[in-house]
Amino acid sequence: MDFFAGIVVFVFGAVVGSFLNVVILRLNTGQSIISGRSKCFTCAKKLKWYELLPIVSFVFFRGKCSACKAKISWQYPIIEIITGLLFLLIFNFQFSIFNEFSFYFLLSTFYFLIVFSVLIIIAIYDYHHQIIPNLFVWIFNGLAFLSLFNSFRISDFGFRILNWNNLLAGFILFAFFALLWGMSKGRWMGFGDAKLALGIGWFLGITEGVAAITLAFWIGAIVGVSLIYLNKNKYGMKSSIAFGPFMILGTAISFFWGEKIISFLF
């Protein structure tokens, strides 16, 4: 992918990231996620088009509302940047397989863009509310179920008979998290994590799925210990943090680099 194409893909991803922010903030609030103009949460000023430009508007207005000067959450540019970079990774990952634009390239890439957009919504919503939104986890699971009939990321792209190994992987990961949820009565894990694990198993298969969950526990442990060490007044051994974002981060890492990580370790 050349530099210009990379810029176009990143900008497209940032625009999608801006929309994902809207979905995350309006989800379960009674507001429509597809209609209604964006406005400042403090003064209710309706935003003009140039105030909605991804990343640029945040920098230009110095992270403040142009009317009331209330601070704007860093979530906006961070999600826009992450989505832009993620779209770049997906396009590079796909382009190296197909080496040319084709129907299969477009279909496969579109599939992965939707999958990871949904995962971003789940991760950020869970981070804020410590609950995985049921609607979007089942959208992800539905998309992951499709991958049982077409991996969407191998050179011999094509629909096939049901992948029983990946189907079983989903149920194994689901059972593991459901067991943790049941044994702890929801203190260790939420049932939403089990539903998310179901889709991760279908999407990645058993090897990369286990790698994703292992990474999630490692990263979660590092972050948890760091939070306790850096802010003992706010966090303690009994503090709870959302695990969904770590599961999704592990999924992304395993999706892009799982084979290299597994071959390095084993």
What is each stretch, according to the model?
Residues 17, 193, 242:
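Short, conserved phosphate/pyrophosphate- and ester-handling motifs at nucleotide-, phospho-/glycolipid
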Residues 90-107, 111, 153-162:
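Arg/Gly-rich low-complexity intrinsically disordered repeat tracts
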Residues 9, 111-219, 224, 263-266:
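Functional transmembrane core segments of multi-pass inner-membrane proteins
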Residues 2-15, 87, 147-152, 250-266:
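Hydrophobic alpha-helical transmembrane segments
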Residues 20, 24, 86, 90, ...:
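Alpha-helical membrane-inserting segments
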Residues 226-253:
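Interfacial loop-to-transmembrane junctions
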Residues 20-27, 62-70, 119-131, 178-188, ...:
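C-terminal ends of transmembrane helices
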Residues 20-75:
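Membrane-proximal soluble regions of multi-pass membrane proteins
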